[in-house]
């Protein structure tokens, strides 16, 4: 997951509207939802936080693309060490654990 990306099934405004019936509490909702990459990594929903170029990926697309490419290549190389059945079992176990966060 890119360093400054967010991960969520609903916007903080939607969450605040549902939980507190007040969309103006979106900042509180965003904090509670743990949307940022470091929190998502801590929850074991992702494998890595990919550091972005200074100022964010939107300021230097070429460098961001190169960083992402290198990360993908490295991770694919690491995965080659595993048998397909092992990878599928690891994926299944991980996905089944998401509900117990």
Language-model region placement:
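Conserved catalytic cores of soluble enzyme domains
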Residues: 1-73, 77
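Intrinsically disordered, low-complexity segments enriched in small/flexible residues
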Residues: 62-101
